[in-house]
Structures are given as C-alpha cells and as structure tokens.
Regions:
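A conserved catalytic-core segment of Leloir-type glycosyltransferases
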Residues: 36-92
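Acceptor-binding helix/loop patch of EC 2.4 sugar-transfer enzymes
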Residues: 9, 69-82, 130-141
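Short catalytic/ligand-binding loop motif for oxyanion handling, primarily in non-cytosolic enzymes
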Residues: 14-15, 44-46, 71-72, 117-121, ...
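N-terminal subdomain of nucleotide-sugar transferases
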Residues: 1-58, 103-105, 128-131
Length: 141
C-alpha cells in the first residue's frame, strides 16, 4: 500500500468546491493508500465526525495546520492580496509539518492537492527524494 502525504488546505466532507473536491480525492485514494493529510483546521469537527463512518477512514490520518478566524475569513476572499501572504505562510508551516511526518512515517509520494491555482505551488516540491504530484491545477492567465 502506498503512503502519501496530501496537502489539502481546504478539505471537508460536507461541502462542494475546493473543500469537497479534496475530500472526494482523499476518500477515494484511501481505499487503496495510506494517507497523511495536512489541512487547515476549519472543518476539523466535520472531518473527525465523518472518519469513523468510512471503511477507509482507518487509512486517513489528518494533521491540522489552523489559522485564526480573521485570516480564515480573509482567505475565503482569494482576490484579497493578503490571501497570498497568509497562504504562503500556511504553506511554509505545512512544508515543516510534512518534513516531520516523513521523519516518522515511510512516505512514497507527496500530493499537492489544493488550493489548486498554478500561482500557489506550495513548498512540498522542495522535499528531496520523494516524487510529487501537483493537481488538479486551475487558474487563468
């Protein structure tokens, strides 16, 4: 079974759009892989409630990298320039968390899942000796 780190800023079992997309990728990958999912903390309660109801829930390990309510509200408005500032900071902390996970777990692949704009690749690509998957990728030029 492959062990995968997934970076999914927005991930929720009860939503559509980015959070729902990430959740659906994760629940389907977890049928075949062991996942270590780093996500923001907004949907923690919903995630923790849903996991025990899924047969593949035992293959889904969540690590939360929460932001303040003020930053969270700002980040939902991605047109705000501050979104990019705080999202980059969040991505750097996620990179540090991923390195800690790799030090403790056998990880085969890294997946940069969302947010899915080509302008925000995160920092997980800096991790050496691990293949990285980035996408799906959206955005317009």
């Amino acid at each position: 079974m492959l062990n995968i780190i997934i970076n999914a800023y927005a991930c929720s079992p009860n939503m559509g759009s980015e959070p729902g997309m990430a959740w659906n990728w994760c629940i389907n990958l977890a049928k075949h892989c062991e996942l270590h999912i780093i996500t923001e903390g907004e949907f923690k309660e919903k995630i923790e409630t849903a996991l025990p109801t899924l047969p593949q829930g035992k293959n889904m390990h969540f690590y939360y990298n929460p932001v303040s309510d003020e930053i969270r509200k700002m980040c939902w408005n991605q047109g705000d320039w501050r979104f990019y500032k705080y999202y980059k900071q969040w991505q750097w902390k996620t990179y540090e968390m991923a390195k800690d996970i790799i030090a403790k777990q056998k990880i085969d692949i890294i997946h940069q899942l969302n947010m899915i704009g080509f302008r925000e690749p995160g920092y997980l690509w800096k991790i050496e000796n691990k293949p990285i998957v980035w996408g799906p990728i959206g955005g317009k030029i």
